[in-house]
Amino acid sequence: MIKKTTYSHPLVHRLMDTEAQKEDREDDDDKTVVEEIMARCFFPALLTTTSWEGFHFVGHEIRITEAMDCYGAVVWPSALVLCYFLETNVKQYNMVDKNVIEIGAGTGLVSIVASLLGAHVTATDLPELLGNLQYNISRNTKMKCKHLPQVKELSWGIALDKNFPRSSNNFDYILAADVVYAHPFLEELLITFDHLCKDTTIILWVMKFRLEKENKFIDRFKELFDLEEISSFPSLHIKLYKALRKNRRSA
């Protein structure tokens, strides 16, 4: 299970423990989990007419076709972290029969894993990515999932009321992996999070830190949402967050 590292040693041991020792233990924990996550990837033993990369999640072999010339059609480590988290935390974050939307779905790996875990999934991305996204989702979920996943266009901040009216947004979870980087649409991304999120919606968001711009987005995000760091992977410069709308009404 991925969880934020905590230690419950006796007080005397904790007082004797140096910061260096703590950092060494945290580095070991990070290395162990990252190795386990990356072990879920495999490549075809033989060359085929269609290039694909393989992953093992939820007891299934998932084959993903990527487009190396397109940033949004590549499986990035953040997606693997989120898939691993969903698979290993099914008791706390049960996907069965939940309404789930993934923004910036890219190749569709996270949406596929959520579908295999029993969720009603809507996978979204830019129009130019939908063909490959639909292909990957169809080939990996057909006859395998409780609910057939949907693929929809979602350009952040554009025609949200028309395509995703607030009255019909009843998402239990919003999933996002590596949607924050050096692109000019961070404000539109924040608007999209806000539009899709109800008081009871849980956002599970994995982020790779690259530039100061990402830290500024975090500050803006925290104006609207209560943000909790669940896990950190220093070797990957990745953090996993859970977020809920601020000032939400009790259910």
Regions found by a protein language model. Give the residues of each.
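S-adenosylmethionine-dependent methyltransferases
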Residues: M1-A251
